[in-house]
Regions:
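GIY-YIG nuclease catalytic motif and its immediate N-terminal context
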Residues: 1-37, 41-68, 83-95
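Short arginine-rich
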Residues: 65-78
Length: 95
């Protein structure tokens, strides 16, 4: 069974990072319906900005935790697919 890690763009411009075993469509619908009480409930509607599929939920959760520790500029570079910028941002942080 596959799993996903995803970044949602919220109505207020913020990002939400999550993971799920459900289909992305189903999970996003849950966020937008208000069924999930938490960060996104007051920031609807949300839209999918980025996702990655994993074979195991444990790998998706590990990536979710990593992404939650990233600054906004790194998340934006990932969403845009700018892998070179990600490397530069990571190197800048280590200096």
């Amino acid at each position: 069974m596959s799993a996903f890690v995803y970044i949602l763009r919220c109505a207020d411009g913020s990002f939400y990072v999550g993971s799920t075993r459900k289909s992305l469509e189903e999970r996003i619908a849950e966020h937008n319906s208000g069924l999930l009480r938490g960060y996104t409930i007051s920031r609807r509607p949300v839209t999918l900005a980025w996702s990655q599929e994993f074979d195991r939920i444990t790998d998706a959760i590990a990536m979710e935790r990593r992404l939650k520790g990233w600054r906004r500029d790194k998340k934006e570079a990932l969403i845009r697919g700018e892998l070179e910028a990600l490397s530069e941002l990571a190197a800048r942080r280590q200096r």
